[in-house]
């Protein structure tokens, strides 16, 4: 599954195992997420558990839970794509939707989106280094096709562009991504670019430590100067 545009998961690759138990379709399918030990989303556990009402791994009622008469595998996949890998995963945490639209909620959503973006990049590295058996070609083909787009987005973040989500619409959130996020990104991107270069993605050389570091530090200095001027 590919992360959607407009979310912190954009262009990321997410692999799930689906198993149909003997009790299917009376019981829902069993779904395992290849997490590499990372918590990229409130619904995707490091253990591989996918927390979703439709899978009976989270509380729900009515159409939210599995029904042998109406629920389908397609519905499971669409739910993961549309309800889990969202633009604002922070609000997927139980009870956090009550903070949607508040200044505190926006700040927390922005911070969570930044972390989700970083973990998505780290997941990409794990996939490139240790793709699940039988999926080596899928992983390589995806990142050869989208790797340049991933790096371009990272370059934009290093210049201050905010990660997609609820954090910066003028209602109490930040207009740019945080300096801490850019510093963390500065460490991840050169490693990711090197991994992309190994599979044939072009243009990765300009994302080396030297030039990238100067770009990110300049963006952070500019952001700090703007903040000082507004105080």
Model-flagged regions — what are they?
Residues 1-12:
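N-terminal onset of structured domains
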Residues 5-7, 20, 41:
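Residues embedded in well-ordered secondary-structure elements
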Residues 10-11, 27-30:
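Short, hydrophobic/aromatic beta-strand segments
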Residues 19-25:
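Proline-anchored loop/turn motifs at beta-strand termini and strand-loop-strand connectors
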Residues 30-231:
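Domain-scale recognition of soluble eukaryotic interaction modules
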């Amino acid at each position: 599954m590919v992360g959607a545009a407009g979310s912190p998961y954009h262009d990321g690759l997410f692999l799930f195992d689906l198993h149909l138990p003997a009790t299917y379709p009376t019981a829902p399918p069993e779904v395992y997420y290849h997490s590499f030990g990372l918590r990229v989303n409130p619904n995707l556990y490091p253990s591989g558990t996918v927390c979703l009402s439709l899978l009976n791994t989270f509380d729900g009622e009515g159409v939210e839970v599995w029904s042998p008469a109406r629920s389908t595998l397609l519905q499971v996949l669409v739910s993961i794509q549309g309800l889990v890998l969202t633009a604002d995963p922070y609000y997927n945490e139980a009870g956090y939707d009550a903070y949607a639209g508040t200044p505190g909620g926006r700040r927390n959503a922005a911070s969570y989106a930044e972390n989700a973006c970083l973990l998505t990049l780290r997941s990409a590295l794990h996939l490139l280094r240790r793709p699940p058996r039988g999926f080596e070609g899928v992983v390589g083909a995806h990142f050869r096709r989208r790797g340049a787009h991933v790096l371009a987005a990272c370059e934009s973040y290093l210049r201050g562009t905010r990660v997609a989500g609820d954090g910066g619409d003028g209602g109490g959130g930040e207009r740019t991504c945080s300096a801490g996020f850019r510093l963390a990104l500065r460490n991840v991107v050169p490693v990711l670019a090197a991994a992309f270069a190994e599979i044939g993605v072009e243009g990765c050389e300009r994302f080396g430590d030297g030039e990238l570091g100067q770009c990110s530090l300049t963006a952070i200095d500019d952001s700090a100067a703007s903040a000082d001027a507004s105080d």
